[in-house]
Amino acid sequence: MGIRFYRAHTPGTRNRSVSDFHEITTSTPTKSLTHANHRARGRNHSGSITTRWRGGGHKRLYRQIDFRRDKVGVLARVATVEYDPNRSARIALLHYQDGSKRYILHPQGLAIGAEVMSSPEAPISIGNALPLVNMPLGTEVHNIELRPYNGGQLVRAAGAVAQLVAKEGGFGTLRMPSGEVRLVAKDCWATVGQVGHVESINLTLGKAGRSRWLDRRPRVRGSVMNACDHPHGGGEGRCPIGHPGPLTPWGKPALGQRTRARKKYSDALLVRRRK
C-alpha cells in the first residue's frame, strides 16, 4: 500500500492523505456475500444514546467475513483483494475447490492467485489457519480465537499482529499489539501473518467533513458545556473545572482511573497488562 498526499489547494486538502488503493483489484463486492447493514448510530433499542459521537456517516453494505475459517482441509485460491468500508483492513475473496466463496481479512503479502488452507496440518505460510498448538514459537498471527471454534475475535485491525511466545500446559502465550501478554487455549485457531494495510495508521483525514463520512460526530469538551451537562461545565468564560481531578459526564474519575473489574474471569489469563 502507498499513501497519496494532497497539495494545499484548499484548507480541506492541506495535510490530507489517502490510500492509493494500489492493492485493490475490483470495486464491486460479491453480491452473495453482502447484505444491507442496519446501523445503530450509537443508539439502543429505545433510541437512547449509548455511545456518544456516532452517526451520520455514508451508507454501507456489509461484507460477510469468514472469521471462523471452518472449511477444514479444502484448498482455496485468492481471487481478489477488495476495499471494505466497515473496517480498516482490506478483505480477500477466496474461491474454494468445492465451488464456495468466502471473504477473509487480507494478510500482508498475500498475493492474487496464492493458495491458502484451514487445517491442523496446514504449513506455516501467510493466510493459512491452524490451531496454536501446531504453530512453532515466534509465529506471527492475527484473527485469534478466544474460545475454540468461536471464530477470531482478537487482532483484526489493519496492521495488527500478535506473536506466539510460549506454549505450556493447555495454553499458548501471545504478545498482543498493545503490549499485553495473555494466555489463550492452545486449541484456539489463528491465521498466520500480519493484517494488511499497515500504513492505515499514518493516514491524515485533513478536514472535519471526512470524519463525518466515517460516522464520527464532533466530540465536545466538557469544559465548554453548561454545568447541567457536565461536571467540568459552567463558570464565567474559561475557568478551571473546579474538581481535584477530571471527571466523566456522570461524575466518575477519568483519565487514568482503572475501570477494569477487579475480579474479572480473565484476570487469570493475563500475564502482563498492556502498556
Curated annotation (Swiss-Prot):
One GO biological process term: mitochondrial translation
Keyword annotations from UniProtKB, A to Z: Chloroplast, Plastid, Ribonucleoprotein, Ribosomal protein
GO cellular-component term (any): chloroplast
SUPFAM superfamilies: Nucleic acid-binding proteins (SSF50249), Translation proteins SH3-like domain (SSF50104)
Location within or outside the cell: Plastid, Chloroplast
InterPro entries: NA-bd_OB-fold (IPR012340), Rib_uL2_dom2 (IPR014722), Ribosomal_uL2 (IPR002171), Ribosomal_uL2_bac/org-type (IPR005880), Ribosomal_uL2_C (IPR022669), Ribosomal_uL2_CS (IPR022671), Ribosomal_uL2_dom3 (IPR014726), Ribosomal_uL2_RNA-bd_dom (IPR022666)
One Pfam family matching this protein: Ribosomal_L2
GO molecular function: rRNA binding; structural constituent of ribosome; transferase activity
Main location: plastid
Positions of region (Disordered): 28-53
Tree of life domain: Eukaryota
Subunit structure: Part of the 50S ribosomal subunit.
Similarity-based family: Belongs to the universal ribosomal protein uL2 family.
NCBIfam families assigned to the protein according to its UniProt record, in alphabetical order: rplB_bact
HAMAP family recorded: Ribosomal_uL2_B
The protein, known as: Large ribosomal subunit protein uL2c
Organism whose genome encodes this protein: Nephroselmis olivacea
Gene responsible for this protein: rpl2
